[in-house]
Structures are given as C-alpha cells and as structure tokens.
Amino acid sequence: MKTRPSVKPICERCKVIKRRGKVMVICSNPKHKQKQG
C-alpha cells in the first residue's frame, strides 16, 4: 500500500474507490494499491 498525495490508476485493472472519505486504488496487482493521505 502506497500513500501519496494524488492517486492514479496504473494499469487497466486498477479501480479508484472511496472508503471512509479516503480515495483509494485497488488492483489485482498488490503493488498498485494506493491510498490518499
């Protein structure tokens, strides 16, 4: 899980979702997981 100021989808399987007011990227590739914070 990477925490960065701006989250962007890296590949076509990345999904941008909002959880508890935080923007997150979830993907089948665990390296692509990101959260904003």
Swiss-Prot record:
> Would you kindly state one Gene Ontology biological process term found in this protein's UniProt entry?
translation
One CC-aspect GO term: ribosome
Signal peptide (from-to): none
Q: Pfam family of this protein, just one?
A: Ribosomal_L36
Q: Which GO terms describe its molecular function?
A: structural constituent of ribosome
Question: What UniProt keywords are attached to this protein's entry?
Answer: Ribonucleoprotein, Ribosomal protein
Q: Which InterPro entries match?
A: Ribosomal_bL36, Ribosomal_bL36_sp
As recorded in UniProt, coiled-coil segments are: none
Q: Which top-rank group of organisms is this from?
A: Bacteria
Task: Please give the HAMAP family that the UniProt record associates with this protein.
Answer: Ribosomal_bL36
The UniProt similarity line reads: Belongs to the bacterial ribosomal protein bL36 family.
Its protein name is Large ribosomal subunit protein bL36
Taxonomic source organism: Natranaerobius thermophilus (strain ATCC BAA-1301 / DSM 18059 / JW/NM-WN-LF)
Gene coding for it: rpmJ
